[in-house]
A protein has these predicted regions:
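Phosphate-/nucleic-acid-contacting segments
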Residues: 78-122
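Alpha-helical bundle regulatory/interaction domains
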Residues: 42-43, 49-58, 62-68, 76-77, ...
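Cyclic-nucleotide recognition modules
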Residues: 1-59
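Generic signal for short, ordered secondary-structure residues
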Residues: 6, 22, 40, 62-63, ...
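Residue-level detector of alpha-helix boundaries and kinks
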Residues: 12, 68-69, 88
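Glycine-rich loops and low-complexity Gly/Arg-rich segments
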Residues: 28-31, 54, 60-63, 102, ...
Length: 122
C-alpha cells in the first residue's frame, strides 16, 4: 500500500496516465465512491484552456509532492511506532475507515507488528 485517499480526494497512476504506459500499481476502492474518469486529450485541453482547472491541478500536484516527500522521510527516519503515532495524530479517521492490514502495509510493517504496536500504545 503506497497511498491512502480519503473522501473528497483523488488518486491516479499519473505516470501511466501521462505517459500512456501500463501502470505498475493498482488502485482499489475500499468503500463505495464516486469515480471521475478523464481521457488524456480532455485533460490536456482543460489544463491549457481552463485557468481554474490548471490551478486545481497545480495545487494538487504540489500537495502530493509534499506528502510523498514527508512519507519517504518518515519511512527512513521514524521507527514503526513513531510512524503509527504520527498517523494517529494526523489522520485518525484512517484508523476507523481502513482495514489494519492496509495501514500496516502503508506504514511499512507487518500486520503482526502493527498489532503489537497498537497493544503497547493502548
Amino acid at each position: 500500500t503506497t497511498y491512502l485517499a480519503l473522501r473528497n480526494s483523488s488518486t491516479s497512476s499519473l505516470n501511466s496516465f501521462l505517459n500512456k504506459i501500463p501502470s505498475r500499481k493498482s488502485i482499489k476502492a475500499l468503500v463505495d465512491c464516486k469515480l471521475w474518469v478523464i481521457d488524456l486529450e480532455t485533460f490536456n485541453h482543460l489544463l491549457k484552456n481552463n485557468k481554474a482547472f490548471h490551478e486545481f491541478y497545480y495545487n494538487l500536484i504540489e500537495k502530493q509532492i509534499i506528502l510523498i516527500d514527508d512519507y519517504r522521510i518518515d519511512l527512513l527516519t521514524l521507527t514503526p511506532e513513531e510512524r503509527y503515532q504520527k498517523l494517529l495524530l494526523t489522520e485518525p479517521i484512517l484508523l476507523q475507515e481502513v482495514p489494519l492490514h492496509y495501514l500496516a502495509s502503508f506504514l511499512g510493517i507487518s500486520s503482526r507488528h502493527m498489532s503489537r504496536i497498537r497493544k503497547s500504545i493502548g
